[in-house]
């Protein structure tokens, strides 16, 4: 059984990470709600926190821990406000709406079937 920092991670980051471990050479098409879109391959996954981003300590009520997935970007389909160039990090705070395997056409993640988004 997995331990999640946030309940939605089960249906988002962990679902995608598990797929990437099963299909390590998959090239994924990663789309965000605002039209921003990338293609890339799984690079890494790790637990992270926002203390450095906000320059805060663990006892600050804004402090948050979460699991992140990192993709090496092979193609920028549609650029947007995130401005990623080489690596794309995703976590529950700004998760894509659709992730598909471009080789198999399989939907790896869809916000439409994510129970944490309904």
Predicted segments, located by residue:
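Conserved RNA-binding domains used in RNP assembly and mRNA/RNA metabolism
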Residues: 2-118
């Amino acid at each position: 059984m997995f331990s999640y920092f946030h309940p939605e991670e089960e249906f988002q980051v962990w679902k995608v990470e598990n797929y990437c471990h099963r299909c390590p050479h998959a090239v994924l098409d990663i789309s965000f709600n605002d039209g921003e879109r990338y293609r890339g391959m799984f690079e890494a996954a790790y637990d992270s926190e926002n203390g450095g981003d906000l320059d805060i300590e663990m006892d600050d009520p804004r402090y948050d821990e979460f699991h992140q997935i990192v993709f090496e970007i092979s193609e920028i389909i549609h650029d947007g406000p995130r401005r990623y160039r080489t690596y794309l990090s995703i976590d529950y705070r700004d998760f894509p709406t659709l992730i598909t395997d471009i080789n198999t056409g399989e939907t790896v993640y869809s916000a439409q079937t994510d129970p944490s988004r309904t």
